């Protein structure tokens, strides 16, 4: 099992798909990496030799921000927005949608579960 960037890649998948298990690498970036290293995309992960794994690691370390570095960068960007009190930063702080979606109804994913509020009670008749 190849271990790249702290992630165990699945042995029985094609290397093109297996690379997408690394945070920050999608299918197009995976294809780009394999082109640079001259590795066939149809090879199974278990069939890679050590030299091919090393070449993939070198390209990832030198050219791309992945895994922990990328997560840290994203969280720092959000913190910066919150510190300078931009609209997006305030929405992050309040846990609301950032991009203009309606919040009177919907937005359940961002706001959390449904909170029932008691309605008006009818006065009893005399």
Curated annotation (Swiss-Prot):
<dbReference type="InterPro" id="IPR010979">
    <property type="entry name" value="Ribosomal_uS13-like_H2TH"/>
</dbReference>
<dbReference type="InterPro" id="IPR001892">
    <property type="entry name" value="Ribosomal_uS13"/>
</dbReference>
<keyword id="KW-0689">Ribosomal protein</keyword>
<dbReference type="GO" id="GO:0005829">
    <property type="term" value="C:cytosol"/>
</dbReference>
<comment type="similarity">
    <text>Belongs to the universal ribosomal protein uS13 family.</text>
</comment>
<dbReference type="GO" id="GO:0015935">
    <property type="term" value="C:small ribosomal subunit"/>
</dbReference>
<dbReference type="GO" id="GO:0006412">
    <property type="term" value="P:translation"/>
</dbReference>
<dbReference type="GO" id="GO:0003735">
    <property type="term" value="F:structural constituent of ribosome"/>
</dbReference>
<dbReference type="GO" id="GO:0019843">
    <property type="term" value="F:rRNA binding"/>
</dbReference>
<dbReference type="GO" id="GO:0009507">
    <property type="term" value="C:chloroplast"/>
</dbReference>
<keyword id="KW-0150">Chloroplast</keyword>
<keyword id="KW-0687">Ribonucleoprotein</keyword>
<feature type="compositionally biased region" description="Basic residues">
    <location>
        <begin position="101"/>
        <end position="126"/>
    </location>
</feature>
<protein>
    <recommendedName>
        <fullName>Small ribosomal subunit protein uS13c</fullName>
    </recommendedName>
</protein>
<dbReference type="InterPro" id="IPR019980">
    <property type="entry name" value="Ribosomal_uS13_bac-type"/>
</dbReference>
<dbReference type="Pfam" id="PF00416">
    <property type="entry name" value="Ribosomal_S13"/>
</dbReference>
<dbReference type="InterPro" id="IPR027437">
    <property type="entry name" value="Rbsml_uS13_C"/>
</dbReference>
<comment type="subunit">
    <text>Part of the 30S ribosomal subunit.</text>
</comment>
<keyword id="KW-0934">Plastid</keyword>
<comment type="function">
    <text>Located at the top of the head of the 30S subunit, it contacts several helices of the 16S rRNA.</text>
</comment>
<keyword id="KW-0694">RNA-binding</keyword>
<feature type="region of interest" description="Disordered">
    <location>
        <begin position="97"/>
        <end position="126"/>
    </location>
</feature>
<keyword id="KW-0699">rRNA-binding</keyword>
<dbReference type="InterPro" id="IPR018269">
    <property type="entry name" value="Ribosomal_uS13_CS"/>
</dbReference>
């Amino acid at each position: 099992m190849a271990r790249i960037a702290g992630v165990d890649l699945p042995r029985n998948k094609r290397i093109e798909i297996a690379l997408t298990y690394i945070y920050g690498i999608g299918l197009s970036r995976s294809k780009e990496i394999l082109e640079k290293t001259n590795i066939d995309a149809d090879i199974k992960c278990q069939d890679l030799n050590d030299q091919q794994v090393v070449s993939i690691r070198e390209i990832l370390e030198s050219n791309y921000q992945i895994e922990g570095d990328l997560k840290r960068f994203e969280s720092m960007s959000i913190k910066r927005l919150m510190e300078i009190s931009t609209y997006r930063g305030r929405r992050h702080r309040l846990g609301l949608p950032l991009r203009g979606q309606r919040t009177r109804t919907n937005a359940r994913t961002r706001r959390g579960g449904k909170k029932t509020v008691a309605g008006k009670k009818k006065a009893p008749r005399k």
